[in-house]
Amino acid sequence: MSRPSSVSPRPPAPSGGGTGGGGGGSGGGGGGGGGGPASCGPGGGGRAKGLKDIRIDEEVKIAVNIALERFRYGDQREMEFPSSLTSTERAFIHRLSQSLGLVSKSKGKGANRYLTVKKKDGSETAHAMMTCNLTHNTKHAVRSLIQRFPVTNKERTELLPKTERGNVFAVEAENREMSKTSGRLNNGIPQVPVKRGESEFDSFRQSLPVFEKQEEIVKIIKENKVVLIVGETGSGKTTQIPQFLLDDCFKNGIPCRIFCTQPRRLAAIAVAERVAAERRERIGQTIGYQIRLESRVSPKTLLTFCTNGVLLRTLMAGDSTLSTVTHVIVDEVHERDRFSDFLLTKLRDLLQKHPTLKLILSSAALDVNLFIRYFGSCPVIYIQGRPFEVKEMFLEDILRTTGYTNKEMLKYKKEKQREEKQQTTLTEWYSAQENTFKPESQRQRAVASVSEEYDLLDDGGDAVFSQLTEKDVNCLEPWLIKEMDACLSDIWLHKDVDAFAQVFHLILTENVSVDYRHSETSATALMVAAGRGFTSQVEQLISMGANVHSKASNGWMALDWAKHFGQTEIVDLLESYSASLEFGNLDESSLVQTNGNDLSAEDRELLKAYHHSFDDEKVDLDLIMHLLYNICHSCDAGAILIFLPGYDEIVGLRDRILFDDKRFADNTHRYQVFMLHSNMQTSDQKKVLKNPPAGVRKIILSTNIAETSITVNDVVFVIDSGKVKEKSFDALNFVTMLKMVWISKASAIQRKGRAGRCRPGICFRLFSRLRFQNMLEFQTPELLRMPLQELCLHTKLLAPVNCTIADFLMKAPEPPPALIVRNAVQMLKTIDAMDAWEDLTELGYHLADLPVEPHLGKMVLCAVVLKCLDPILTIACTLAYRDPFVLPTQASQKRAAMLCRKRFTAGTFSDHMALLRAFQAWQKARSDGWERAFCEKNFLSQATMEIIIGMRTQLLGQLRASGFVRARGGGDIRDVNTNSENWAVVKAALVAGMYPNLVHVDRENVILTGPKEKKVRFHPTSVLSQPQYKKIPPANGQAAAIQALPTDWLIYDEMTRAHRIANIRCCSAVTPVTVLVFCGPARLASNALQEPSSFRADGIPNDSSDSEMEDRTTANLAALKLDEWLNFKLEPEAASLLLQLRQKWHSLFLRRMRAPSKPWSQVDEATIRAIIAVLSTEEQSAGLQQPSGIGQRPRPMSSEELPLASSWRSNNSRKSTADTEFADGSTTGERVLMKSPSPALHPPQKYKDRGILHPKRSTDDRSDQSSVKSTDSSSYPSPCASPSPPSSGKGSKSPSPRPNMPIRYFIMKSSNLRNLEISQQKGIWSTTPSNERKLNRAFWESSMVYLVFSVQGSGHFQGFSRMSSEIGREKSQDWGSAGLGGVFKVEWIRKESLPFQFAHHLLNPWNDNKKVQISRDGQELEPQVGEQLLQLWERLPLGEKTTSD
């Protein structure tokens, strides 16, 4: 692309924004695109010399942006720009197209030169040949299956693509019938309500602002079909409006039936209980609630509170479900969650069908005009609140009045003078660099303009911002500083690449920070490497944890250095890495610099110093603690409500208050700390509403749930972090992220309104006035920022039969873009949830029932059929929620965190394994009471783990409700976990769920390729990015990582794209056979398999190579085409066998989907056995590891322990007093007072195991335990160093058996059979003194100790017993052998002999994976193996003794 001389060079703006009015950076069509990398033009293959800024008129920039955005989301494949454009304007379009992932080309000459932009076509990517070589054993396993059970004609035809649409009505009726029991509201008839009872709340009700408008509200609802009610939070609208309707119907003798929806489960239960109490009724009579998997309703219930999701599921059973309903109230409409918008779309349609139905929308901060337009001029009732005055304090006021400062703010003030000097030196560096590096461009560029431009930024952006976490500069010895400075200067000024070796050496051996700054210029090694174009060193630095957001004294980040000096490859690399970091756009310092004119000089300086000291992306817990202390010591009594974005921050702040901050921890009797989160149990929430005892202050840590759903009347002080966690989704890249973003103005006003309910209050806002002015008016509707696959499934169940999904969603209050809907529908077709006519398949109906995204739902259902459910439940819930590994800020810790993640993978080339084993090790640490220390040590989030447990419980509950997991017999929890220990099988379920997220290894070019990507890289957080973890990562890290892969296929959870580079994270290496059997559609075209001869005759070109040599070798290979991209070349016999195995699997899967509860047939069992044999054999032949212990059942949590289904519970010794829900119902405040939990309040685990406590819990994992089996046997190996809990240092006597410890299993060897007979008669045993201490300790530390007996040389186990006393000093004369120690009591459970061959398959990881029978006396068994060994006795016919050999 020839660049005309009129394009004047100018460095990019430091934040990556474009120059001129366009702005907007290099990315997704903001208002410009000035900063993107220039393409090298269609002709030139070389790198662009420099990324010069392209200056064109702002109108052209904006017009081009709009045109390209429309094109991106539209149907056209190609778009042409007029030939009247100048070459500069064309250059701008080329660059912007490239940054948007489009292909642009210019054709023609002179005045006829025009430019076309095309969308990338998947087929464009040439890829390496996809092959699959089967081992002899694999072929044998498939042959045996096919000989015994050939693929039947019925199976074959069922798996052919449909040619015509089936009878939709019949299928739909059958499937709706099948799934209607789950999570629906029951069908009652309207009745006249009973008279309300008088209660203690009557006077309070009458004082509510809404009470005055009772008659007006009832009258307007009677006269209109739709009514909007806007009332300030706490005005009483949620609890009173449904009661006004009940009372009116009672008075006039009119039957009614009312549904009232809430956005959250917690609110639905809380409001229902409150309303029942106000009417002096028990919950479940007139007033009830229903949430997913839990309900309290009866035939008398006339007012049901439910979640939006439950009402939607009810409507999915058909429109007639509302025929007996008189009123539907949709509360908190302003939250605009996807279900409420979706519900309104459906309800608007239903209002025409049900003339008597009334719809009431209630909200605190409604975008009223939108809804008036949507429902066609309906009346609006406004209810004023009666709050007292609330004073506002913004960030600058807080800093000024409280005098808050921190080390970094002080340091910043000192650094300012130094910084000016650094800028001057930096400018000299640039000019020196340009003298040596770019003589030809030197004539055009005046160096002065560089410094002038950056002087405009006052004192140069976030210069000292990232030195803050580094103690290094002040602690380093002078020779180190001198040495580092010299190295960085040499690299920059003399292109001395060898100096990097010394830099890496100093970072690792002398503890110099990887973000060390050159003392005279403030440049880091990453900036210097980026500006100089040293790509592999940039990669190395990033993998060592270098901060890509660090800024030099002129405000430039490494990315700006790379752009300015024309290093396009590094620009791509840094942008792709930055794009994949989970941050919203929160930087406030730039705002202060640009718009801070109305700030006083003092406030401006304060804010600038603060923003230099703290990263806006996070929540400043230090500042919150400072404020808390100030409030508690200088303000009157009154509850404090603190709004935080998520559970992580809530737990972090709670721990500071209760344990870490001495000012509070030493005075816990003065505070009650409560936590509110939507996934939390209601018991804590009920206590929040009660007034605390005198002299005790209530501190409530909450997410945005306390904005509207829950009103706490005694709140006087609100601390608002200004943040919320929001899921956002890029529909074009299919990437979902949980981002922390700024709240909307409407939310900020709501939060302020929570103070001053009982007297004047204060709202402390941890953001500036300027930030507040720049906030969005209302939150973006979830419908516009969420992945729509789940919603499209629900649409099919709600929309009329012949209405397309897109047509139905276009009726929403703010419809999502058509392209996003189309992409979602296409994805559902790809994963077999829908057919070509957009009708749901059998799989689709089940996926609509599961509370996770469809691809994860498919993964879980495949795991049920493959019988490896537990590991997949854990992995699926983790992927659905978030990565439990936290990213530390310091570079040295980043490396340690990476190493920890790597240890959890156990050499399996799988990030998914790291997630699974981290969860298992955390559960083990939790049962041993040291999970907090464990999480800190392994860089894990305690909060995330607790949420994952609750999600598992909910998902398992849904599988039970749908009939996939039975209570007992075939299909019970044990049966669906038969293969959980086999990692190859677990990965098959992962592959089935992850498809089409696959990449292929091109060994020849050492790159990864995808269906639409020519080049894919591992994200630095993936363990696969650093195969052999070395202290210094290899220079060509990605290539080394690719070469180390044992197979040619990878699955990934998420791909982030930026420019020409795609990053994949959460990957696992899988075998080609897994891809061939589990990927692609279930229904393959009849010509999917092309035999070699026909392959030649058809003349289909071989796209893998042009060389004749290769043509000859592929000529005798068959082709098996699974989809447009997956096209395998393999031996004809292998192709035919694999196609048949695929057909057997898919027909089995289809049968299970049609009848989940039906018993398995012989064919089904044989198919699964063959698949497992094939997967295991191929996994072994690829040299992939099979770690032990992955199938361990998680520890069941008793009902008080489930964090989501119940109150939060932690066995951590430091925390348990703060957040254990004690059996005596004491409040949190009282709990805080107790320094240690009383043992009496924890019933011993033994009784729990016997089912005496909580005998029935349908959602719990434990309803399937036999007397022997105990799922408490989890004792997980912790892969990170020192798995044992930190010891107290002093030997302590154990007071009583610890309740929450795992069960232990030991082998007892006897020299003769007579001793065993004595033991069985008298119930006693003795062992050698060397075993005594071990057994005694196990007896005291665990809930149960099982002893498995074997007489040496007998070839049998002779039974097992339970140890029922500790070992005493008294010895027995009965034993014939000398050298035995004291006697202890045992309780024999099974006395039958079990031949060793029954246990051949059991290997003990705690004895070098030897078979269990090869054990010495006193050998401990790994708990899961012990449990499996005991279960073998269940298979022996009862009472029938096997004789010993």
From Swiss-Prot:
ATP binds at residues 231-238. RNA binds at residues 1309-1311, 1325, 1375. It is an enzyme of class 3 (hydrolase). One of its GO terms (biological process) is germline cell cycle switching, mitotic to meiotic cell cycle. Residues 53-121 form the R3H domain. Residues 1303-1433 form the YTH domain. Its EC number is 3.6.4.13. CDD domains: DEXHc_YTHDC2, R3H_DEXH_helicase, SF2_C_RHA, YTH. Residues 1246-1264 have a biased composition (Basic and acidic residues). It comes from the Eukaryota. Residues 15-48 have a biased composition (Gly residues). Present in male and female germ cells (at protein level). Highly expressed in testis. Not detected in spermatogonia next to the tubule wall but is strongly expressed in spermatocytes, suggesting that it is up-regulated in germ cells upon entry into meiosis (at protein level). It is found in: Cytoplasm; Cytoplasm, Perinuclear region. Changing residue 327 to R: In ketu; homozygotes mice are both male- and female-sterile. ANK repeats lie at residues 521-553, 554-586. GO terms for cellular component: cytoplasm; endoplasmic reticulum; perinuclear region of cytoplasm; ribonucleoprotein granule. The modification Phosphoserine is found at residues 1104-1105, 1107, 1278, 1282, 1296. Residues 1179-1189 have a biased composition (Polar residues). Interacts with MEIOC; binds transcripts that regulate the mitotic cell cycle inhibiting progression into metaphase, thereby allowing meiotic prophase to proceed normally. Interacts (via ANK repeats) with XRN1. Interacts with ZCCHC4. Associates with the small ribosomal subunit. Interacts with RBM46. 3'-5' RNA helicase that plays a key role in the male and female germline by promoting transition from mitotic to meiotic divisions in stem cells. Specifically recognizes and binds N6-methyladenosine (m6A)-containing RNAs, a modification present at internal sites of mRNAs and some non-coding RNAs that plays a role in the efficiency of RNA processing and stability. Essential for ensuring a successful progression of the meiotic program in the germline by regulating the level of m6A-containing RNAs. The YTH domain mediates RNA-binding. It recognizes and binds N6-methyladenosine (m6A)-containing RNAs. PANTHER family: 3'-5' RNA HELICASE YTHDC2, ATP-DEPENDENT RNA HELICASE. 'Ketu' is a harbinger of misfortune in Vedic mythology. This is 3'-5' RNA helicase YTHDC2. It comes from Mus musculus (Mouse). The gene is Ythdc2.
